[in-house]
C-alpha cells in the first residue's frame, strides 16, 4: 500500500504542486475575477494537462481543482447546480494525472459566507463544505487541503468538517496587508489553534509572496510541534504591498511580477531550513517552478534528454551564448 501523507511527512519534506486558476486564466480557460473551477467540466483536457505538468515536475501531491468550488461561489457564474459534477470531475482529473506517482488531495477553500459571531453563517459554511467534500469523497481522495482562509473561525469549521471524513486534514491561512487574520489572530495563534483543534497540518498559503510569507512560517514553526505547511505564490510582493492581489497587475496582468524558477527554488530551500514540512506553491507557480523546487529539495523530477555536445558540429544559439557567458569577464 502506498504511503499516506502523514507517513511521508514523518520521513521527509513533501513537495506540493503549483497554482491553477491564474495559469488556466492565462491559457484561456478560467474567467479572471471569479476564478471558479468549472474548467473541470468545460475544459477537462486543459486541467488534466496542467496536473500532468506538475506531476512531471516532481510534485508529490496533486490538488483537485476545486478551489471556489462550493455551491454559493459557483452560483455567481451560473454553475451552482453543477457543484457535484465539477467537484467529482476535479478529483477524477487529479487522480488520472497522479496515477501512482503522487497523492491526490481534495480541496476546500474560503466561502465568503463566513461572519464572525454568527451561528447561522457558520451553519451555512458547514453545509457548503459538507456538500463539496461529499462529492469529492465519492471519487476518492487521499487527504484534504483546506486553504486560503482569512478568518481563523472559518478555518476551524474546515477542520471540524474535514475530520468527520476520517482523512488527514491540512488547513492553511492567508494574511493580507496586516500580520493578523481578519479576526485578529497572529500566525502563531493560528497554527497552534488549528493543530490543537485536530488539524494534522497547519500553515499558510496564497496572497503573500515568499519574501513576505516565510517570516510567518517561521512564527508558526515556533508556536507548535505539529506539521507546518507553506504554499507561496510565485509573485514578487513588496513591503508597501505584501500581498499580490493588491498589486496593480492583478488579476490579469501579473507577468511582470512573476518570480523566476531559481527564486522559487531558493524559497523552497529557505522553507525547509525554517522547518516547514509540506512545501508547495500557489498562484503564479507553473511546472518550471515546481521542477526547480524539486531539484532544490532533492526530489526526483523528469529531466530532459541527456545529451553531450559535439565540438565538431555547429552550436545552437542557446549553446553559443551559454558558452560565451561562461567565458565572459563581465
Language model segments and positions:
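Domain-level signal for soluble alpha/beta catalytic cores
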Residues: 1-330
Amino acid at each position: 500500500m502506498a504511503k499516506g501523507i502523514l507517513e511521508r511527512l514523518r520521513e521527509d519534506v513533501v513537495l506540493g504542486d503549483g497554482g491553477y486558476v491564474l495559469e488556466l486564466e492565462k491559457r484561456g480557460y478560467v474567467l479572471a475575477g471569479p476564478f471558479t473551477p468549472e474548467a473541470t467540466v468545460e475544459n477537462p483536457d486543459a486541467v488534466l494537462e496542467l496536473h500532468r505538468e506538475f506531476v512531471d515536475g516532481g510534485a508529490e501531491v496533486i490538488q483537485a481543482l476545486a478551489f471556489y468550488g462550493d455551491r454559493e461561489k459557483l452560483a455567481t457564474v451560473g454553475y451552482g447546480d453543477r457543484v457535484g459534477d465539477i467537484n467529482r470531475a476535479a478529483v477524477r482529473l487529479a487522480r488520472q494525472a497522479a496515477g501512482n506517482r503522487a497523492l491526490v488531495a481534495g480541496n476546500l477553500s474560503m466561502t465568503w459566507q463566513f461572519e464572525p459571531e454568527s451561528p447561522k453563517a457558520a451553519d451555512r459554511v458547514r453545509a457548503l463544505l459538507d456538500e463539496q467534500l461529499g462529492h469529492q469523497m465519492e471519487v476518492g481522495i487521499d487527504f484534504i487541503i483546506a486553504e486560503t482562509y482569512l478568518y481563523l473561525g472559518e478555518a476551524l469549521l474546515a477542520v471540524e468538517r474535514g475530520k468527520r471524513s476520517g482523512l488527514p486534514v491540512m488547513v492553511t491561512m492567508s494574511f493580507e496587508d496586516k500580520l493578523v487574520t481578519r479576526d485578529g489572530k497572529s500566525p502563531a495563534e493560528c497554527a497552534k489553534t488549528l493543530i490543537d483543534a485536530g488539524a494534522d497540518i497547519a500553515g499558510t498559503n496564497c496572497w503573500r509572496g515568499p519574501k513576505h510569507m516565510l517570516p510567518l512560517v517561521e512564527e508558526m514553526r515556533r508556536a507548535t510541534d505539529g506539521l507546518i505547511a507553506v504554499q507561496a505564490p510565485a509573485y514578487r510582493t513588496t513591503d508597501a504591498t505584501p500581498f499580490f492581489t493588491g498589486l496593480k497587475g492583478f488579476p490579469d496582468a501579473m507577468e511582470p511580477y512573476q518570480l523566476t524558477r531559481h527564486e522559487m527554488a531558493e524559497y523552497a530551500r529557505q522553507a525547509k531550513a525554517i522547518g516547514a514540512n509540506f512545501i508547495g506553491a500557489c498562484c503564479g507557480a507553473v511546472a518550471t517552478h515546481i521542477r526547480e523546487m524539486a531539484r532544490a529539495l532533492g526530489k526526483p523530477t523528469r529531466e530532459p534528454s541527456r545529451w553531450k555536445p559535439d565540438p565538431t558540429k555547429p552550436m545552437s544559439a542557446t549553446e553559443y551564448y551559454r558558452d560565451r557567458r561562461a567565458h565572459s569577464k563581465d
